[in-house]
Swiss-Prot record:
GO biological process: carbohydrate metabolic process; cell division; cell wall organization; lipid glycosylation; peptidoglycan biosynthetic process; regulation of cell shape
Cysteines joined through disulfide linkages: none
PANTHER family: GLYCOSYLTRANSFERASE, UDP-N-ACETYLGLUCOSAMINE--N-ACETYLMURAMYL-(PENTAPEPTIDE) PYROPHOSPHORYL-UNDECAPRENOL N-ACETYLGLUCOSAMINE TRANSFERASE 1
Catalytic activity: di-trans,octa-cis-undecaprenyl diphospho-N-acetyl-alpha-D-muramoyl-L-alanyl-D-glutamyl-meso-2,6-diaminopimeloyl-D-alanyl-D-alanine + UDP-N-acetyl-alpha-D-glucosamine = di-trans,octa-cis-undecaprenyl diphospho-[N-acetyl-alpha-D-glucosaminyl-(1->4)]-N-acetyl-alpha-D-muramoyl-L-alanyl-D-glutamyl-meso-2,6-diaminopimeloyl-D-alanyl-D-alanine + UDP + H(+)
EC number assigned by the record: 2.4.1.227
Major localization listed first in the record, in broad terms: membrane
Keywords associated with the record: Cell cycle, Cell division, Cell inner membrane, Cell membrane, Cell shape, Cell wall biogenesis/degradation, Glycosyltransferase, Membrane, Peptidoglycan synthesis, Transferase
Domain of life: Bacteria
Top-rank EC class of the record's enzyme: transferase
InterPro entries with a match to the protein in the record: GlcNAc_MurG, Glyco_trans_28_C, GlycoTrans_28_N
Membrane topology: Peripheral membrane protein
Name of the protein this chain belongs to: UDP-N-acetylglucosamine--N-acetylmuramyl-(pentapeptide) pyrophosphoryl-undecaprenol N-acetylglucosamine transferase
Species whose genome carries this gene: Geotalea daltonii (strain DSM 22248 / JCM 15807 / FRC-32) (Geobacter daltonii)
Keyword Ubl conjugation applies: no
Amino acid sequence: MRLIVAGGGTGGHLFPGIAVAEEFLARNSANEVLFIGTERGIEARLLPKLGYRLECISASGIKGQSPLTKVKSAALLLYGYSQSRKILKEFRPDVVLGVGGYASAPVVLSARGLQIRRFIHEQNAIPGLTNKVLARIADKVFISIEESRKFFPEDRTMLTGNPLRKEILWNVQQGKTEPKGGSLRLLVFGGSAGAHRINTAMVEALPHLAKVKEHLLITHQTGEKDHGEMKKAYGAAGFNAEVTPFIDNMAAAYAAADFIVCRAGATTLAEVAVSGKACIFIPYPYAADDHQRRNAEALLKEDAGFMILERELTGDTLAGQIIRLMQEPELVEKTAANIRKFGQLDAAQVIVDEMTGKQEPLCTEK
């Protein structure tokens, strides 16, 4: 069988698609996967490293843009649709999975025109515009959070959880070694592109953390733009910190961490949940429909995490929460146990089962 995974742009969209691709390929050595994305998205940098084939199309967002930009985006959508039809006719997939992001729309629309089975996966509590539209023509909608069900057709919506990569699941099963010298390990990241506000808050927090720096090991994914300045700041303050623009092996980073400071995107929540890590969530305030805050609140209701809203974020506030977790290991353990209950280990298997359960003829020339 052949599968196309369409979408990306950010790790939050791409990583669930990679997880499904891994499971699909593991089922049969003859299976094939093709990703379709854009040259601007994280997929263009990451997928070649992982050995996946990627085709890029033209696509852009429409929501929240100026009238002129909307016209240009609509033109790109039409061009992307034409590109997608050509790719689908050449690859001849059995199924198409849209994972959100700009590239998802023209590909799934093309799949409908070519009568190819098509599915979409929604990662967040509040769906994006692309998936809300595509749900009308999808054979089935897979959701990660029960709260999002009300936005989709009831008879074609299925709660699966958020698919996770095999390396994440493997590290969960392996556990981790004890920290050297009794130091606690803090992982800080703001998504695949970093988060400037989290970066600046950590710089502001360093003076407040000075009294505990001998007992703290920090791994910080900064993104490309802030990497140089962040590296200098940690060095000048005398912290034991690994500062990197991008962490290729997030599974190892999760496994090594004792607690985490991060955003509250759906894929991040799914990964930290199965990893069983206490987290200080700092939701991205400009996410569509404030969905990151809604994602985090679902965990806070069950004492499965901590949250600092960005409008309340200061170096002092962040440092205070970090020090609290360092000083209260029982609280860290309790929170980790609670968040682990949200982990769904079989999401990728369930999705692949559903997509391959009813095989349709290969795409034919239209």
